[in-house]
Amino acid sequence: MSTKQSFKIAGVDGCKGGWLVAIVEVKGKRHSFELTCMPPPITNFSDVLWATKGCKVVCIDIPIGLSDRDRWRCDQKAKEILGNRQCCVFFAPIRPILSYKRYPAANRTSRCLSGHGLSIQSFNIMDKIHQVDSVMTPNKQKRFREVHPEVCFWALNHGQPMQRKKTTDAGRKDRMRVLAPIFQNLRGIVTKDNRAKGVKVDDILDALVAAYTAGQVVLDNYSTLPARPQRDGKGLRMEILCPAACDPKFGVLKPPHLSC
């Protein structure tokens, strides 16, 4: 997908009130990144599809591709990479429980079918996972790709996890330090006056690092977790993307046509 022309990409993060969408334009031969639009949170994922229709790639912080029974997914690889910060990654729910509305029943069924319980954190975002899964197809997945912001920050931070929580002042500063060389006026973007109601600074930073990763996908400068993803029962790849990294220890590789 490499290109020398300007193009638009997007990063999407789940937040209070729905989905936060950061639409970014990548300009010129030097590939500068400029935030062009960040509307108030969008309630339904179907509207996210419409809002990002002009974007080449959209990276989303939500599981895409789900197992029906086992923990086939990429979550374990992400945990291994993040080491002592692996608590940031939650195992995705199995597809048969997506419509469950009560945690005890979802947890019980998950344990029965997969041998593993369901974390309360995963249950709390299960409605969003269901929204995405209900519309996602292998063809749509060519443009809509899964990321985990902490894995993206790991890649941008020279293979070192962010050690401080994103909800703390110190953690936000750590992540802004990584993103500041990429996005001009980052401080202005995250100021309270420029944030929609209910949107937190860490929501914006997660959406921006997802958007940056989308740009790297267009430029063929990205990695996948695992290096050779499996497909689920719908034919969706179970993978997490991040900016290019090369760490055979964890099975993180550039695409096959790029050398490490």
Q: Which ranges hold each PLM region?
A:
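Phosphate- and other anionic-substrate recognition elements at nucleic-acid/protein interfaces
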Residues: 2-260
